[in-house]
Amino acid sequence: MQPRHPVRLTATLCLLLASLATFAGAQDKPPAVDESLRFAIIGDSGTGSSSQYRVAEKLIASRSSFPYEFVLMMGDNLYGNENPSAYQKKFERPYKLLLDSGIKFYASLGNHDEPNQRFYKPFNMSGERYYTFKPKGNVRVFALDSNYVDQKQLEWLEKELKASGSDWKIAFFHHPVYSSGGRHGSDEMLRAQLEPLFLKYGVDAVFQGHEHFYERIKPQKGIYYFISGGAAKLREGNIQKTDLTAKAFDTGYHFMLIELTKDKLNFQAISDLGKVIDSGSLPRFSDEQKKAFAGDAALPAPKPTATTGRNK
């Protein structure tokens, strides 16, 4: 007996074979990879106080829902004594679970830090006051020493920025070039030294500490600036009303979580009580937009003077 619907069966068989071929071809390709980069930020953290440990607990707990790959330190990593027991109390003990799980910390030097911290292996500074690393293919991170910005550091920074072909260029250091803080405020000399290079070579975001609060600055010439200096120190009520502030928080301690996708910077600032105090998704400015913002970047950065060193 002949099949009742030979044409229909033949068509069905062809579709099935085509589907199997497509599936086999898809299996030859590697699975989709999450190209985003996640990291955390702490600043002015090294006190050994209960506030540092409280922030550290929330930082550790957040990794279960936000699996960050490393932590950037904004300076003032160790206040006061820096003997071996101080390193244990102010760094190794509060962040032990992260260190044991292989999370790397990358430090910058603050005004309360001894330069010899750069030789402490868990800070991953490789013995340098300033350095750069590439955590993922489209991201390059630049750690600077804002305590003393000499011509050698500026020349190094320009060379590294120029050589970087990364889409995302992230800088971090201690002293803020834009700030609404009543104690310190914006470091205009540092801004005059660094901003022309940031503009010329398309830096996307800058993270800083020193001010013991959280502040997200309104975009400045196509660059996003954040102050995150409250991981163990707090200067309550210190933020002044200025036109710089997009969001500010000076009534509690905090840390930050950052995610970089192909074209967005997603962020959260989280208090020591686990409350999200600021969050958002910021678009990466295009190369064309950056070139437009860099109109004044051709001006040479001022050379450092005897007052360039910062110890306040």
Where are the language model's segments positioned?
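Extended active-site neighborhood of metal-dependent phosphoesterases/phosphodiesterases
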Residues: 31-33, 60, 79-169, 183-205, ...
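N-terminal secretory signal peptides that target proteins for export/translocation
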Residues: 1-7
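Substrate-binding/catalytic groove segments of enzymes
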Residues: 66, 234-237, 264-268
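Residue-level marker for buried hydrophobic side chains located in beta-strands
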Residues: 39-41, 71-73, 107-108, 171, ...
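N-terminal active-site segment of His-dependent metallophosphoesterases
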Residues: 25-86, 147, 152, 180
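Bacterial N-terminal signal peptides
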Residues: 10-21
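A short C-terminal boundary segment appended to hydrolase-like catalytic domains
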Residues: 248-312
